[in-house]
């Protein structure tokens, strides 16, 4: 309660002060009289006047009272130019900083909650360009002094930066007003102090840093390209390296705009998602789910039975699913769309030239106005001692290695409890493997809230999976033809024997062999890009897993639009990649879907929120389907229906999430979802009931009391 009370008190002080000033307005003639009296008093109280003046100026600016202009003039009249200039410069900056800190203390929580996830992106912009913005605003004296103080206080700008930039930015304006104050007795009005030409001059001076920045960037760009000869004509408008989720969309968009585009792929069209990731994993998840339903058919009033799992036939179905989808991403389809598809290894020779070592033999060099790197990612294998000896599997290799096995691996270790490891662990357990899931973190699916991890882990354990969290793998080996892995937990080492091990601890971008190092393009965990997905060279862009920060197929396609449009039309208009609403799902049983903030993320970032939770065990359709487990959890701005984040755990969570993704993207609140008809009986009603739970928690009790009395009166 302290903050609201303090805020109300400060507002009352400011309002009363303003009302008093309006009742006794200050004009130039009154100021001149006050100054003449103070000049006489100054003769015997010089230092006291300096201290009182400085304190008064600080209070006026800290409380945002409309007296700063008059006090600046008075400084020139009382103390002369240099002493007045120094006094005003420091006092105004100190007062402004106090107002800045007060706004941060009193209002920042409210603003964080109101802006939600956008607050983080605003602060990123302030961290990068905040000093430039502030300097520009300070240089233009007609912009409200108090407004700048309050607005900047709501950002993450450091107080020290604010003080220094404010003081430097206000020097010119301070000098003008203090100098005018030295001639206060001769002034007839304030209009001559800040004339239109002077305001324009200040504005131009304020814009100078931005102009200088543009010039510097232009010079840097010219320097970057200086070692290369730009072609006078180009063979292509765009060359895309990689035909995965991002590369295919890039090529599709470019062809749709009638650009001449070449798509280069070194391995399989469709990339990891089609051939090793999303599609094959979902195919095996479905087979595993059917096997589980057969074992538990009594849930549906049927006789349970143990399914006969011929693992090679399951893998044959996986291959067939991939083959059925492959035409969507095929060379023929994209050729028919107008894309030139070349199969081979691409290497960027210079900013406008790509050399392709063709699988069919020979090499081909093409010049291009723009290049998009969309080379994807590959499984990361930790450098454990002995890991190569045991013959580990990854999400890339397991499909081919295990395709002819009649049975699933009897003893399977899955290293990593993230989305990939979790999905594969449950699938293989349901298909007959004895699975041990090893996770170094304190819980599986660490990106989600703890209650999500707990619910999924309980499901895993019901499927017979041994879940070992907080266990660190330290070495692997083979003893008497038996493979093993050592893990450490609470300083104790344990040995686990296995027949096969799947490594699923993450994925690393493919960065080597494309000529990036030779061009000086920075690569770390990903290719370094700016907000427009441009690399060091503005005509070379990156999209998808290789660019980060997300590793989802749908995000790769999302980035592809920005990368392609910026590559083709960046000279006219560029677009910053928009990551404000990024959904994802983990297809375990139960499924987990999320968009926006989790509770843990909201707490870590200091964003105020309310939680509304609806248990799916209450949902009619879920009960009818014998799938009455899970929940819908919605985070909203306190007291408002604006959605900050949603987590859904339960059957078809990934599908149910789409309604909230749409709502967040287009600024629709829970009231809109509540007011939308949902078909009965469907799982989608869970979203509406969650919105209803929020509405019930925000019913106006006084209004209900009035309505109850109205009904009582109507009954007579």
PLM regions with names:
Residues 388-406, 495-573, 658-659:
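FAD-site-proximal beta/loop scaffold in flavoenzymes
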Residues 2-7, 16-56, 89, 93-149, ...:
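Membrane-interfacial helix-loop-helix
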Residues 304-305, 323, 340-343, 347-361, ...:
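A Rossmann-like FAD-binding core segment of flavoenzymes
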Residues 281-319, 576-577:
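Glycine-rich active-site loop/strand segments that organize a redox cofactor
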Residues 278, 375-434, 438, 517-536:
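Glycine-rich dinucleotide-binding loop and its adjacent helix/turn
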Residues 320-327, 331, 400, 408-413, ...:
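Rossmann-like dinucleotide-binding cores of NAD(P)H-dependent redox enzymes
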Residues 236-263, 421-430:
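N-terminal Rossmann-like FAD-binding beta1-loop-alpha1 element of flavoenzymes
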Residues 241-243, 255-267, 279, 283-287, ...:
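Flexible, glycine-rich terminal cap/loop adjacent to redox cofactors
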